[in-house]
Amino acid sequence: MAPGGSALKEALESNSTGVDYEVKMAKVEANSKPTKSGSGSIGKFHSSNGVYELLECPVCTNLMYPPIHQCPNGHTLCSSCKLRVQNTCPTCRYELGNIRCLALEKVAESLEVPCRYQNLGCQDIFPYYSKLKHEQHCRFRSYSCPYAGSECSVTGDIPTLVDHLKDDHKVDMHDGCTFNHRYVKSNPHEVENATWMLTVFNCFGRQFCLHFEAFQLGMAPVYMAFLRFMGDENEAKKFSYSLEVGAHSRKLTWQGIPRSIRDSHRKVRDSQDGLIIPRNLALYFSGSDKEELKLRVTGRIWKEE
């Protein structure tokens, strides 16, 4: 092995504060591409694949952040996985103890790395320890499945989720920017908490989810209809929608901006950001003997200029 490689191994495996910092950085400088000169960029390096792999936890394969732990033989892993493996090194089976890999933490501090959502469109580069915070709010990050009828764990981009809703949840897809839906329930007095996603609308080349829910608002049973946009909040603000329900020369109307599916259906419901219909009024609109819910909700979506 070359002398430089041996020095790097010793530096990465050591947790001693007396190790020469220039030795610890030797391999990084050899395998990393310097950034352009500028404020705050001196001494920072774009990560090469080799250094990047050193920072991947061998158990969960996620990038490691302080405290980075190591066993007496120098094998590293993240603090979360240290608990999962019951303090035993998964590589050599030695007891882990409480040894910090300070050298690797210092190496990470010198790196600038791309966002994990680079393949989805994010082209920004971040200092290693700022990357995680950015990714929690990156506008290119994956979306959660917007289906409201169950706690679905599927995530992905919008085309993936549209196919998932259609194929796995059997949600109706509708082309157009107007809707006219009739809700029928034979036992409305027994429905205290329920949620339905009736359809997904393809409108202006984008997708919108129409929700209808029954829940208690304080002591009053109510129904609520609202729209969510399959995209981020900034894009959602480019659209508006209206909802209307009524009968017997009376009607309720609602106009607003669709919420992004970044906000869960429960969050939208709890904020009361939609058309709210008291159950007694809904049954009045239903006609007949008020024992069956027959509620027609109409509306449209338009694009703000």
From Swiss-Prot:
Q: Which Pfam families does the UniProt record give?
A: Sina_RING, Sina_TRAF, Sina_ZnF
The processes (GO biological process) annotated in the record are: protein ubiquitination; regulation of autophagosome assembly; ubiquitin-dependent protein catabolic process
Zinc finger residue extent: RING-type: 57-93
GO molecular-function terms, A-Z: transferase activity; zinc ion binding
Region span, SBD: 107-300
Location in the cell: Endosome, Multivesicular body; Cytoplasmic vesicle, Autophagosome
Q: Specify the residue ranges making up the SIAH-type zinc fingers.
A: 110-170
Q: Identify the EC number(s).
A: 2.3.2.27
Tell me which residues bind Zn(2+) 1.
C115, C122, H134, C138
Task: Provide the residue positions that the database annotates as binding Zn(2+) 2.
Answer: C145, C152, H164, H169
Recorded GO cellular component terms are: autophagosome; multivesicular body
Known pathway: Protein modification; protein ubiquitination
Q: What reactions does this protein catalyze?
A: S-ubiquitinyl-[E2 ubiquitin-conjugating enzyme]-L-cysteine + [acceptor protein]-L-lysine = [E2 ubiquitin-conjugating enzyme]-L-cysteine + N(6)-ubiquitinyl-[acceptor protein]-L-lysine
Give the keywords, sorted: Cytoplasmic vesicle, Endosome, Metal-binding, Transferase, Ubl conjugation pathway, Zinc, Zinc-finger
Source species, domain of life: Eukaryota
Q: Describe the task this protein carries out.
A: E3 ubiquitin-protein ligase that mediates ubiquitination and subsequent proteasomal degradation of target proteins. E3 ubiquitin ligases accept ubiquitin from an E2 ubiquitin-conjugating enzyme in the form of a thioester and then directly transfers the ubiquitin to targeted substrates. It probably triggers the ubiquitin-mediated degradation of different substrates. Mediates the proteasomal-dependent degradation of ATG6, a component of the autophagosome complex. Requires TRAF1A/MUSE14 and TRAF1B/MUSE13 to target ATG6 for ubiquitination and subsequent regulation of autophagosome assembly.
* Record's comment describing the protein's domains: The RING-type zinc finger domain is essential for ubiquitin ligase activity. The SBD domain (substrate-binding domain) mediates the homodimerization and the interaction with substrate proteins. It is related to the TRAF family.
Sequence similarity: Belongs to the SINA (Seven in absentia) family.
Assembly, in brief, is: Interacts with SINAT6. Interacts with ATG6 and TRAF1A. Interacts with WAV3. Interacts with FREE1. Interacts with ELC/VPS23A.
UniProt protein name: Putative E3 ubiquitin-protein ligase SINAT1
Q: Which gene is this protein's source?
A: SINAT1
